Amino acid sequence: MAPPRANSGDGNDGAVGGQSKLSPSGLLIREIPGGYGVPFLSPLRDRLDYYYFQGADEFFRSRVARHGGATVLRVNMPPGPFLAGDPRVVALLDARSFRVLLDDSMVDKADTLDGTFMPSLALFGGHRPLAFLDAADPRHAKIKRVVMSLAAARMHHVAPAFRAAFAAMFDEVDAGLVAGGPVEFNKLNMRYMLDFTCAALFGGAPPSKAMGDAAVTKAVKWLIFQLHPLASKVVKPWPLEDLLLHTFRLPPFLVRREYGEITAYFAAAAAAILDDAEKNHPGIPRDELLHNLVFVAVFNAYGGFKIFLPHIVKWLARAGPELHAKLASEVRAAAPAGGGEITISAVEKEMPLVKSVVWEALRMNPPVEFQYGRARRDMVVESHDAAYEVRKGELLFGYQPLATRDEKVFDRAGEFVPDRFVSGAGSAARPLLEHVVWSNGPETGTPSEGNKQCPGKDMVVAVGRLMVAGLFRRYDTFAADVEELPLEPVVTFTSLTRAADGDGAARRGV
C-alpha cells in the first residue's frame, strides 16, 4: 500500500470542485492530520517516545494537541523496526471514532490482535488462535462456538473456584503482614489466578499440583515470548531493554519445552471438552482446538486477570476508607457473615455499588488498551466534530484509555468515580455502559459466533465483582502503596483491617 498523503491538519478540508464534502451525518470531511515522517528513523523515534520519553498517554495527547485537538491521526505505532514491517496506522482517540473498531462489517481483524506485528505461529503449535481470526473466517464461528459453550457450562464453577483462590491468597497476605510485611499483591495474584482459571474452566488438578510450583513461571515465559515487543520498563537500563525486547523476535524454540508441558497439562485437563467437541462440533481438528484452549485459558483469561485485578485493588486503595465503608455495608447486607457464601447472583441483584466499581475500573484501565482492525473498504470515520476518509486496507488503531475517558461522553472522565454506573432503574447507566468497551464490544453487547467480542466477558466481570465483594466481606478497610508501570500497577499491601469476628474483635496487620 502506498503511503497516504500526510496532512498538517491546518484547514486542509476535503473538497471536490471547490465544494466542501460532508459525511452522512453532516460533518465536514477533512484529510487525516499527522504523518509518518522519514522511513525507519521516524518510527524508531516514535517508539522511544512511546515507551520511554513520553509514555503512551502523553504520546497521543501531545499529538492531539499538535493537530488542533483532532482525535483521528496518522501515527507510527511500536514496535517499528525491525519487528514490524509497516508501523503506519490511523489512530482513533475518541469514543465516537473508536466504535468503528467494534463493527465487524467495517474492519477485518485477521492477525491484528497485537497490532503491527504478528507472533510466530510456532508459539501456538503451528495454529492460528481464535483471537487472530477475523469474524468472517469460517474457523472463527466453529472455534468460538466451543469456547462460548465452555464458558457458559462452567459459569457455576467460577464462584467456588474463586473463593478457594481468594481465601488462600489473602491468608498469605494476612500472614505476611503479621510477620512484618508489606506484601506485594501482584506476585500472589499471578500465582493463585492461574490455578483459579484452570479450576473454573476445566476442573481437575490445578497446574500447581500437576506441573509443580514452576507452572506460573512457564506460563508467564510463554506470554513474554508473544508480547515482548509491547512490553517496557521491565529491564534496566532502557537502551538495553529496547535492544532486547523491541528490535528482534525472541526465538520460539527457547520456550518450546515450557509450552510443550503446558499443552500436555491442558490435553489432560480439557480432555472431556476435546472429546465432546469431536462428537458435537465436527470440523475442528482436536490438536487445533487444544492449542486454542491453551490460548484462551492462559493468554485471554489468566493474562487478563493478571492485569485487571491489580487495577481494581489500585483504585480501591486510592479511594480510601469512605468508599470501603460503603462497600462493606452493601456486601454484608447482601451476604452477612455466617449467612452463606457470596454468589454471582447475589452480586448481580443486591450489590449495585460493587458492580459500578468494577465497571469503572474496566473503563479507566481496560485489560487490553488497544484495538486494531484493517479497513474492509474505503470509508468515512467520524469523530465528535469532524469526519475523515480512510482507504481500504489501512490499519486502524484505537487507544482505549483515551476513548473510554472521553470528556464528551463521561463527566469527570479522567477520575475514578465509584458510583458512576449506579442507577435505581438502570436506565441512566445503560447509555454510559455502551462506551465501556474493554471486551472488544460494548458492555451492553453480547458475544456471538459472528462477532469479535470476548467470549468470556461475563466471567471476567463476575471475577472482578467477586474480588471486590470478597475483600469487603473479609476486611473493613485496607491501605496499599501503588507503583504505576506500563502493563499493570504493582500494588503492595501495607495494612488490612479484618472485619469484626463474632466476639467483636478486629485484627490488623501492619
Swiss-Prot record:
Enzyme Commission identifier(s): 4.2.1.92
Keyword Electron transport on entry: no
Membrane-crossing segments per the record: none
Cofactor(s) recorded in Swiss-Prot or TrEMBL: heme b
Gene for this chain: CYP74A4
Pathway: Lipid metabolism; oxylipin biosynthesis
Keywords on record: Fatty acid biosynthesis, Fatty acid metabolism, Heme, Iron, Lipid biosynthesis, Lipid metabolism, Lyase, Metal-binding, Oxylipin biosynthesis
PANTHER family membership: ALLENE OXIDE SYNTHASE 3 (PTHR24286:SF365), CYTOCHROME P450 26 (PTHR24286)
Role: Involved in the biosynthesis of jasmonic acid, a growth regulator that is implicated also as a signaling molecule in plant defense. Converts 13-hydroperoxylinolenic acid to 12,13-epoxylinolenic acid.
Catalysed transformations (reactions): (13S)-hydroperoxy-(9Z,11E,15Z)-octadecatrienoate = (9Z,13S,15Z)-12,13-epoxyoctadeca-9,11,15-trienoate + H2O
GO molecular function: allene oxide synthase activity; heme binding; iron ion binding; monooxygenase activity; oxidoreductase activity, acting on paired donors, with incorporation or reduction of molecular oxygen
Residues annotated for (13S)-hydroperoxy-(9Z,11E,15Z)-octadecatrienoate binding in this entry: 300
Tissue expression summary: Expressed in dark-grown seedlings.
Induction (record text): By red (R) light and far-red (FR) light in dark-grown seedlings. Not induced by abrasion.
Cell inner membrane as UniProt keyword: no
Protein's name in the database: Allene oxide synthase 4
Single GO biological process annotation from the record: oxylipin biosynthetic process
